């Protein structure tokens, strides 16, 4: 059967005739008896001329004076028009001189057959062609990536670095060349390696001009490098790999997570050696003052209950002696008197118990009456532990507690902006002078005080004071501790 390229459906019909008929007779009956039946738009001759239907295929055989066969008509019409043509075939009742009957058996969707063929072929292509080529392509891709990474590594004063270290406004300081290569693999091109704990002078000079983030390994070596960098370089942020892992071992997801979790250098516990000595000395002096104040406060409290306790013991002992003396017989007495005496001895202990309870109650009342005076004496002897006066920023500090955020206020205490603590220093440096007060959930450091004085801030409110060597006179500092 010949079909056009646009064939959508094939009409299958069965024909039976009471006599001997041949193929030309059937084709002539199909065209002749349907002509003018469905109108000009569905005329079979016109549809065949325009290619809307294909060549009519007839297979018929004759036996014992009767003929039977099949008719196939390919169609590129839609479902509705194809169904109308199929129904029109069943109206044919004569083929030549013989009575005949045509019955439509099915309408085949050619596109479904093509879909099945496409699926089978796609399975074959997928299993036989792609399996052998994927490993080879992967090897080629890995080789190209490795070559590009090696070519991108540059050396600045013999230090491995990415190609954008000198041009970028911010740099990452890592430990070794493997760390730089791993970061280049994920598109980070502004990393430079220090190659050990001896920090080169180049890194110290770059830290003065650029925003520096130290990205250390999650081991002891990373801590040592961080301490060294804090002493000789101007570090802005600190990022750390997960515990037990090096930067060269991290996946892209771990690298991004570690860099997003970076913290300002002010939040890092370790500080340069000179500041550390001052901080330790201040902490030792504070602890000594607190210990002396606590001893002075505890001295009156410890001495107060001693005297009532001795009085209570002195009062208790004569009662016990009197009871013991009353229980000792002075001589022989009649039996009735001894019985009375034993009854009295059984009844007498109740009175001393009541007197003891009364004395204990009186002693507790005296202690409760005297204890409220102790905090006053303690405040008089240790004025350093006086409670902090309430501030107009207390409510705002409660709102910021635990958020690691900061609020910038104008002269009227209105909130201008809210930023993260790690971005506070850069935000203040870029401010235009309208910020007069800063309230943040963090530690007040020397660097923060210097920036506040430079920007003419009036008030700086934080959680506590850090290692501050010099406090500007024009900046009022308030802490919640």
Swiss-Prot record:
Record domain Toprim: where: 169-243
Residues that coordinate or bind Mg(2+) 1: 175, 217
Basic and acidic residues bias: start-end ranges: 312-393
Signal peptide (UniProt feature, chain positions): none
Keyword Oxidoreductase part of the UniProt annotation: no
Region (Disordered), start-end ranges: 275-393
Top enzyme class: transferase
Cofactor note: Binds two Mg(2+) per subunit.
EC number, UniProt record: 2.7.7.101
Superkingdom per UniProt: Archaea
Keywords for this protein: DNA replication, DNA-directed RNA polymerase, Exosome, Magnesium, Metal-binding, Nucleotidyltransferase, Primosome, Transcription, Transferase
Chain positions recorded as Mg(2+) 2 binding sites: 217, 219
Protein purpose: RNA polymerase that catalyzes the synthesis of short RNA molecules used as primers for DNA polymerase during DNA replication. Also part of the exosome, which is a complex involved in RNA degradation. Acts as a poly(A)-binding protein that enhances the interaction between heteromeric, adenine-rich transcripts and the exosome.
Self-association and partners: Forms a ternary complex with MCM helicase and DNA. Component of the archaeal exosome complex.
HAMAP family: DNA_primase_DnaG_arc
Protein name in UniProt: DNA primase DnaG
Upper lineage: Archaea, Methanobacteriati, Methanobacteriota, Stenosarchaea group, Methanomicrobia
Gene: dnaG
């Amino acid at each position: 059967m010949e079909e056009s390229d646009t064939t959508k459906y094939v009409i299958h019909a069965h024909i039976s005739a009471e006599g001997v008929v041949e193929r030309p007779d059937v084709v002539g009956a199909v065209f002749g008896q349907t002509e003018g039946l469905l109108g000009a738009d569905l005329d079979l001759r016109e549809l065949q001329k325009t290619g809307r239907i294909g060549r009519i295929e007839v297979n018929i055989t004759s036996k014992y004076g009767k003929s039977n066969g099949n008719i196939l008509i390919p169609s590129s019409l839609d479902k509705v028009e194809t169904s109308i043509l199929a129904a029109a075939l069943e109206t044919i009742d004569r083929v030549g001189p013989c009575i005949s009957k045509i019955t439509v058996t099915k309408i085949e969707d050619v596109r479904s057959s093509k879909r099945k063929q496409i699926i089978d072929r796609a399975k074959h292509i997928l299993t036989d062609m792609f399996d052998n080529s994927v490993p080879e392509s992967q090897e080629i891709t890995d080789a190209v990536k490795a070559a590009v990474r090696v070519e991108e590594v540059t050396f600045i004063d013999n230090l491995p670095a990415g190609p954008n270290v000198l041009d970028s406004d911010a740099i990452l300081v890592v430990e070794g060349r493997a760390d730089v290569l791993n970061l280049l693999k994920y598109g980070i091109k502004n990393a430079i390696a220090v190659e050990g704990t001896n920090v080169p002078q180049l890194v110290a000079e770059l830290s003065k001009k650029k925003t520096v983030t130290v990205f250390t390994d999650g081991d002891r070596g990373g801590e040592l490098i961080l301490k060294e960098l804090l002493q000789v370089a101007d570090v802005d942020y600190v990022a750390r790999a997960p515990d037990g892992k090096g930067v060269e071992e991290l996946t892209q997801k771990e690298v991004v997570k570690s860099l997003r979790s970076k913290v300002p250098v002010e939040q890092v516990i370790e500080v340069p050696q000179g500041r550390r000595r001052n901080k330790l000395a201040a902490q030792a002096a504070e602890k000594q003052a607190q210990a002396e104040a606590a001893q002075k406060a505890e001295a009156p409290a410890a001495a107060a209950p001693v005297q009532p306790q001795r009085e209570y013991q002195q009062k208790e002992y004569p009662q016990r002696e009197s009871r013991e003396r009353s229980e000792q017989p002075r001589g022989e007495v009649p039996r009735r008197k001894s019985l009375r005496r034993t009854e009295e001895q059984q009844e007498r202990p109740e009175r001393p118990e009541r007197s003891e309870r009364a004395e204990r109650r009186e002693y507790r009342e005296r202690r409760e009456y005297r204890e409220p005076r102790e905090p006053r004496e303690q405040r008089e002897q240790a004025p350093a532990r006086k409670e902090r006066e309430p501030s107009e920023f207390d409510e705002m500090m409660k709102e910021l507690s635990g958020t690691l955020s900061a609020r910038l206020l104008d002269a009227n205490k209105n909130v201008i902006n809210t930023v993260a603590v790690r971005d506070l220093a850069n935000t203040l440096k870029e401010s235009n002078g309208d910020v007069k007060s800063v309230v943040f959930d963090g530690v007040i450091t020397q660097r923060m005080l210097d920036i506040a004085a430079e920007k003419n801030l009036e008030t700086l409110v934080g959680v506590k004071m850090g290692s501050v060597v010099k406090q500007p006179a024009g900046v009022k500092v308030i802490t919640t501790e």
